[in-house]
Amino acid sequence: MARCCRHLAVFLCVLLMLSLCKALSSNVDDGYGHEDGSFESDSLLKLNNDDVLSLISSDETTLEASTVSVSNFGAKGDGKTDDTQAFKKAWKKACSTNGVTTFLVPKGKTYLLKSTRFRGPCKSLRNFQILGTLSASTKRSDYKDKNHWLILEDVNNLSIDGGSTGIINGNGKTWWQNSCKIDKSKPCTKAPTALTLYNLKNLNVKNLRVKNAQQIQISIEKCNKVEVSNVEITAPGDSPNTDGIHITNTQNIRVSNSDIGTGDDCISIEDGTQNLQIFDLTCGPGHGISIGSLGDDNSKAYVSGINVDGAKFSESDNGVRIKTYQGGSGTAKNIKFQNIRMENVKNPIIIDQDYCDKDKCEDQESAVQVKNVVYKNISGTSATDVAITLNCSEKYPCQGIVLENVKIKGGTASCKNANVKNQGTVSPKCS
């Protein structure tokens, strides 16, 4: 009997410790994710990030995985019926379901949507599968929010997967025709971003096609730990402001194996972007990869840790560009562009610290400091007489600019207020 009592006591202690671990994992991040760093209780028990994720995962696997399809909530998918409310109902169900959950947009159908917000936090939503087509309403009156069409926000540990068949179609022609950049007689008004990803952690976007956005195609804002791979983004070369991927206030991003051709920047990188890795990108038509514009309206801007390794630019207005306004402040630093091919690009390499997108900009002394920028193993042809432009600030000259094995045919170099070091074969050279 005594032995049985001892065994029972040990068993109860184990149960108590497991309960304590589960309680601690709940305190880390309310059960919806985890933060960087480790958690230490007042007791002798210590949990690191891997321990917390393990506890959460083991808790989820005890519940049955489920799929929530928009078809089960009344979505027709005929391309004509407004499916907005059906999507909202399906999202509410998926977001509140326990266990690993998938929000499913079925293959082979086209779902007409007005402006729609998919908001978290969610209990255990892990997959957003877009296997069919999301098609934007062409009625401008259907957009109460003129800045956004689809918004996904406040959801952690999520995969957005197009399965190579999923399409997001912004049907932007109506908006382009009414743009002041196309018709100077019309007032300049706002237009929606097709897909806004806001305040997300541990996000994976893959195997997705986005086309013909009303304005920006994909905007990544205030996110951390983002992976984008195998995406195709397209819009006509004359479509206004249709940036492919716009990144701001986001850290730890990787974009790889993607093809982007639009009427604006293939990738635009703005204030607050840190540790961005871009691999194996094809760009064109478009305005290339642009860091900036930074420092508009005399603002402070900070961008650092940008690495572009492996890219091809074809018939684009720019290749790799850094652009800042006069009057701004801050830094754009620790930037590397390498292993890049230019084919008939108008401005293959350009730093422009006198950028102005208005009729007239006043001369100002202050500027964003550009420093520690490396251009390595870049070759190809320029479509203009100037292949390399380094137009830096007089008061805050560009520092630590390195050109290594850069060979661009068909143009000269124009360099002003730039501290440049040449390594290997460089042509054309700054005089």
UniProtKB/Swiss-Prot annotation:
Chief localisation class: secreted
Disruption phenotype: Impaired pod shatter.
Matching InterPro entries: Glyco_hydro_28, PbH1, Pectin_lyas_fold, Pectin_lyase_fold/virulence
Residues annotated as signal peptide: 1-23
UniProtKB keywords: Cell wall, Cell wall biogenesis/degradation, Cytoplasm, Glycosidase, Hydrolase, Repeat, Secreted, Signal
GO-annotated molecular function: polygalacturonase activity
Enzyme Commission code(s) on record: 3.2.1.15
Protein location: Secreted, Cell wall; Cytoplasm
Tagged with keyword Transcription regulation: no
Pfam families from the UniProt entry: Glyco_hydro_28
Domain of life the protein comes from: Eukaryota
GO biological processes: anther dehiscence; carbohydrate metabolic process; cell wall modification involved in abscission; fruit dehiscence
Recorded catalytic activity of this chain's protein: (1,4-alpha-D-galacturonosyl)n+m + H2O = (1,4-alpha-D-galacturonosyl)n + (1,4-alpha-D-galacturonosyl)m
GO cellular component terms listed in the entry, alphabetical order: cytoplasm; extracellular region
Keyword Signal: yes
Positions annotated as PbH1 repeat: 223-249, 250-271, 303-324, 332-353, 398-420
Family membership: Belongs to the glycosyl hydrolase 28 family.
Protein role: Polygalacturonase involved in cell separation in the final stages of pod shatter and in anther dehiscence. Not involved in floral organ abscission.
Name this protein carries in UniProt: Polygalacturonase ADPG1
